[in-house]
Amino acid sequence: MKQTTMISAKNINKKWYIVDAENKTVGRLATQVALVLRGKHKVDFTPHINNGDHVIVINAEKAIFSGKKESNKFYYHHSMHPGGLKKRSVSVQRELDPTKILERAIRLMLPKNVQGSNQYRALHVFKGSEHPYAAQKPEVLEISTKKGDVK
């Protein structure tokens, strides 16, 4: 009778992937990147072990939103002081720091615990096509652009 194999933290080989966000919808890109960060694309996925891979996202400023979200979607945060609610539209955020748009979308799709924060550290988002991780020899990760189109 076969036993279920359980992986351990010392047996994990993390790969590096690179994703080009140019003309990709933010939500579809974020869900597929979050799956790779969690390791759910692997056959030996184990919920209590962080066996996700590193993901480099380039051209973050060229990611798109569908519909009128560029002007109608807002990011909120509060300073915890009376009257301290701040809001910023996507277009304003894109001018200030476009990498934060993708970072926030992906972070909110990861677990809200210690393991989720460790998986979030494996995300590297860059404005433009230059990145300092060429030595890791990242593989290109194809992101599907249509609903139901899984590659």
UniProtKB/Swiss-Prot annotation:
Keyword field contains Ribonucleoprotein: yes
Reply yes or no: does the keyword Ribosomal protein apply: yes
Q: Keyword annotations for this protein?
A: Ribonucleoprotein, Ribosomal protein
* GO terms under biological process: negative regulation of translation; translation
Annotated PANTHER family: LARGE RIBOSOMAL SUBUNIT PROTEIN UL13M, RIBOSOMAL PROTEIN L13
In terms of HAMAP family, this protein maps to: Ribosomal_uL13 (MF_01366)
Of which family is this protein a member? Belongs to the universal ribosomal protein uL13 family.
Task: Give a short account of what the protein does.
Answer: This protein is one of the early assembly proteins of the 50S ribosomal subunit, although it is not seen to bind rRNA by itself. It is important during the early stages of 50S assembly.
Which NCBIfam families does the record cross-reference, listed alphabetically? rplM_bact
* Protein name per Swiss-Prot or TrEMBL: Large ribosomal subunit protein uL13
Q: What is the lineage of its organism?
A: Bacteria, Bacillati, Mycoplasmatota, Mollicutes, Mycoplasmataceae
